[in-house]
Amino acid sequence: MRSIREARRAILLGALSVAMTGCATVKPAERPRRMTVRTTAYTGGEPGGNFSATGTRLRFGGAVNSAAADWSWMPVGTRFRILSNSREYVVEDFGSALVGRETIDLFFPTFAAMHEWGTRNVEIEIVEWGSYPVSKMLLDRRLDVSYVRRMAEGVNLKLALHCQ
């Protein structure tokens, strides 16, 4: 089991390095560093289980927690901090209800914690923006799913606008 995860991680890291040598993503100066966003909550008991769209185990309670978003708005790998509680998150998942919405879905380990969070508008600070090329690479493997196609179209548009 561990060797399969290690192989997935090696493939992802290799693909990431290839993708990073491609065109630049949206220029950092054009992206906000602080914003107020709508957040919702999800847990591993929902469809998809305890693994993210990147293949990593969903995380909570450590240095960095897992989050999901529409990758055409907030690309995979984006790290942010919720200012009210100082928790840091990384976008490594997506969900059908997030496509076309500027909402972040935060991972919680239990249904009780998920319901306690509910829906909140919070101020976040972007620690590091993620990668549209890596988002594209990961989404392109799942284009048979309609909401993934919609997200991929948005990612492709971002890439087309910012690549020469």
Where are these regions (language model features)?
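Solvent-exposed, well-ordered loop and adjacent helix/strand elements within mature globular domains
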Residues: 23-164
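Hydrophobic h-region of N-terminal signal peptides that target proteins for export
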Residues: 15-24
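N-terminal export leaders
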Residues: 8-12
